Regions:
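Fungal secretory targeting signals
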Residues: 1-26
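Sequence-level preference for short, compositionally simple segments enriched
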Residues: 19-336
Length: 336
């Protein structure tokens, strides 16, 4: 973690608006009407080439459909004036388990100037929905290496997978939702400074490590809106990984006003009894944190929690965290 945080055809204004909501458990094996098509028999061979063909000036909704396959590239979605939906081919939209589209690369901060530029997907446009895509950073242990850099408001990721080791997801700005998705990592693998992020029905897979941290929220003042809520999710060792009991913490404070809640979440014994950890011994950063839990279950939810954490008397709601208008941009069919 460094202090600096330094995806068919372009739709015309008269084109049919891209669909933005699909019923869970429906298949999606061909491009929705009006979408740019990547891979298979589509016009575009890379995801980035389809992204580059999007209109930067149109306000009509746009979409991209990606055929099954592995795409070895880094993708940057610049700010658009329209809503954008990116679909991955799948026979089951309700889950990440049947995903057939993977975007993967291995940049890290060893060869990029900041966290954002290491990400497999650099998502800088607001009003973005991403469905059933696996985002992977293969760098592994040793450096910051992101699968996703989410840098804009009203972004939703549904039935996706995010895999990395350190700093897997940068939830940096705006309001964001991650639902029915899989997130994997070891060190600070959900982190950022200003975003309000709601994680719903997600599986968090932790990798083999002597010690690990799921979140590292960098909220730096009482006026900073940042808030991470992990709701109705599961925490366990990632498939194929052996993780010692108590090796992982729910989070540590990147900044003093760090704010994270885990609620109604199943935790295996990989979670330490203390739950939460100081940033480091000489610089704890716990004086203004909000670290809380409600109705969690499993062996990892038991024990004496850190003195700077608390228990809530009721669960937080999406409207409380994301705002009363959240259903205007969130695909609520994916929420618990």
């Amino acid at each position: 973690m460094l202090p600096s945080i330094a995806f068919v055809l372009t739709l015309a204004a008269s084109a049919v608006a891209a669909p933005t909501t699909l019923a869970p458990r429906a298949g999606r094996t061909s491009p929705p009407s009006g979408c740019l098509a990547v891979g298979g028999s589509g016009k575009y061979k890379t995801v980035q080439s389809a992204v580059d063909a999007l209109s930067a000036s149109s306000t009509a909704a746009q979409c991209i459909f990606i055929a099954k396959g592995t795409y070895k590239e880094q993708v940057y979605i610049k700010p658009l004036k329209s809503a954008l939906t990116v679909y991955g081919e799948t026979t089951d939209t309700s889950s990440y388990t049947g995903n057939t589209v993977t975007i993967t690369q291995g940049k890290s901060q060893d060869d990029a100037p900041n966290n954002d530029e290491t990400a497999t997907l650099r998502a800088w446009t607001p009003n973005l929905k991403v469905y059933n895509i696996n985002l992977v950073n293969t760098r592994g242990q040793g450096s910051q290496a992101l699968a996703l850099s989410a840098y804009a408001d009203k972004q939703g990721y549904y039935g996706c997978q995010f895999k990395g080791y350190q700093d897997t997801i940068l939830a940096q700005q705006g309001s964001q939702v991650y639902a029915k998705s899989y997130i994997e990592g070891a060190t600070d693998f959900i982190f950022g400074q200003k975003a309000i992020a709601w994680f719903d029905g997600c599986s968090l897979g932790v990798l083999t490590a002597s010690v690990g941290y799921i979140t590292a929220n960098g909220r730096d003042s009482d006026s900073n809106p940042s808030y991470y809520v992990i709701n109705n999710s599961k925490i366990a060792a990632a498939p194929g990984n052996t993780v010692s009991a108590g090796a992982y913490y729910l989070g540590r404070p990147w900044r003093n006003f760090s704010r994270v809640v885990f609620q109604k979440t199943s935790m295996t014994n990989v979670i330490n009894a203390a739950g939460w950890k100081v940033w480091n011994t000489d610089d704890p950063r716990t004086d203004k944190v909000t670290y809380a839990e409600y109705a969690n279950t499993g062996d990892g939810s038991k024990g004496t929690r850190a003195s700077f954490s608390k228990k809530l008397s009721a669960a937080l709601s999406p409207s409380t965290v994301l705002g009363s208008d959240y259903k205007s941009w969130v695909d609520a069919a994916y929420l618990s």
